[in-house]
Each structure stands twice: as structure tokens, then as C-alpha cells.
UniProtKB/Swiss-Prot annotation:
One of its GO terms (molecular function) is metal ion binding. CDD domains: GT_MraY. It comes from the Bacteria. It is found in: Cell inner membrane. It is a multi-pass membrane protein. This is Phospho-N-acetylmuramoyl-pentapeptide-transferase. It comes from Acidithiobacillus ferrooxidans (strain ATCC 23270 / DSM 14882 / CIP 104768 / NCIMB 8455) (Ferrobacillus ferrooxidans (strain ATCC 23270)). The gene is mraY.
Amino acid sequence: MLYALFMQLGSLYHGFYVFQYLTLRGVLATLTALVLSLFIGPFFIARLRRYKIGQMVRNDGPETHLIKQGTPTMGGALILLVVILTTLLWSDLGNPLVWVAVLTTLAFGAIGFVDDWRKLRRQNSKGLSARAKYGLQSLVAFAAGGVLYALASNPVETSLILPFIPHVLIPMGAGFIVFSYFVIVGTSNAVNLTDGLDGLAIVPTVMVAGALGVFAYVSGNAVFARYLDVPWVPGSGQMLIFCGALVGAGLGFLWFNTYPADVFMGDTGALALGAALAIVAIVARQELVLFIMGGVFVVETLSVIIQVVSFRLTGKRVFRMAPLHHHFEKKGWPEPRVAVRFWIITVILVLVGLSSLKIR
């Protein structure tokens, strides 16, 4: 909205044309989202407390988590509000990729909202059934993949790109839709599984979103894409604005979510943020780089899969508790130590992912 306004005003005063630069709008989107989060956050959290929208804690979880009972949850609605508003303010709304990102994120947030609401209504930690949750996620993910496939103007936009290996494109054709489904649903649920400690999920999300913004900017610029030998995807640069909004909103949320947390994002935020990261990675053709940079999300998910398979086959558990962050808590690690060490690992993985821009 602001972008369109400034472009109109540019005919009156050429100085307004400075807002056509993606890098400037990316920075402004980050700052806008951060300020909005910090300003709205206290009022939003107060409302959650007023209406007793509090976290339900599992009885079989770490004992230290019992004090979290009743902490305001569904804070992800704040993140969603800020991200979407900021994106609409600073993006080129004539770009269909912007709408795919916004609507997919909003849809996954809505699924998470229903899940959180049912937990509150039932006064336990069980929300939507697994079948209902994955069914709804599948509908949205297939729809998003289908739209992106229809929007693709050349084979590169639906081909698998291998990081660190130059000039390798694996055409997927219509299989791109199925591949996108797994990336979106997998990333969404991986972030959700990671969201079990104060600040644990939001910091890696911010780091990965920032890095994906760089990839999106490069892939949307024909000159940079050619120089760095990455796929050129026309229009993908607008995802830099979306990523800037994710970074700003995430940092603003962290202000209230850092240990000891004043609010939790709930499934409303975790499912939406995971889907948002996935959409940007798909648009920028960097799904495998997302797998690297989001290594913490991947390991957390694998720990759950390993735990379930092991228990069903042998009756024994590999970890003291899954996801993995609870295993370390059960070993006696303080919650902040677990979170910060996972953040450090994410810093390393994000740097590895970014290095793929040059190492080819």
C-alpha cells in the first residue's frame, strides 16, 4: 500500500522513487514489524491474560515446565498480524508471489488457531486430531504448490537445485507440486515441534528468514543471479520484504518470549512461521538450503520419529523424552542453556547455507 502510494507520488517528486529499491523496503519492513510488535505486544498480552487464554502443560513433561501453566498463549496471532500488515504496506501487491506467501501463512496460522482454541476449550494439551490437522495442512499446501506451479514461467522455477553443485537442475514437472507439499507441511510441523522452550523456535526462525531473504533478493535480480550462478526467478525479490517482516516481528515477539516467557506463540504462530519459511525457500528455489539452515528443526523432528519408531518396534525409548530439547532438559540442562546452544548451532548452519551462494 505504501509502496504504491510512493510510486504515485514519485511523479510529483522524484525523491519518492527511492522506495522502489527492495533493500530499502526490506529494512523498513523489518523496522516497521519490530516497532509494531513492541508497541502492540503489551496490550495484546494483557488481553490474553484478561480472557484467561493460557498454556496447558503436559503432566508427563519436564517438571520445570509446570510453572508455565497458565502463561498466555496464542501469541502467534500477534506475529501473524504484524507480518501480514507490514508485508501489505511495503510489498508490490501486484506481485502474485506476495499473495501466495501471505495467504499460505495466514491459512496455516488459522489451522494453528483452531488447534490452540480447542486445547483451551477442552482444558488439556490435545487440540485437533492428527487426521484433521494434516488434512487441512495438505489442502493448503497442495493449493499453494499448485498456484506456484501455474505461475512458473520457465522450467528453472520448478526444478530442484542442488546447493554447492553448479549447473545442476533436476526437472520435477508436475512433481513440483508434491515436492512443495512435503516442504511446506514438513517445515511447518518441524517448527511446531521445536517450539517447546522459551525463545527456542523464534530465534532460529528469525535467522533462517533473514538468510532466505538474501537468497530471494539474489534470485530476483537477474545480474546477481547470473553472477552467483543461482536460478533467476522473476518477482522473487519481493520475498525480501516478507522476510524482513518475519525478522522484525520475530525479534519483537522474542522481547516477550525470552526466558522466562510472558507469552507463547502456540500452534497459531509455529505452524504459520514454518509455512512462511517453506514458501520463501520454494519461491527462491532453495529448499535444500532450507534443510541445511533449519537443521535444528530437522533434528528435532527426527528425534520424534526415532522415538516413536523405536518404542513401537522394541518397546524402548532412544531419548529420555522427545523432541530433543526435552531430552537435554531431562538430563539436567537448564532451559536457557538448551535454547542458546540450539541458537549457536543455527548460526553455524545459516552461515553454511549462505556460503552456498559463492561455493559452487
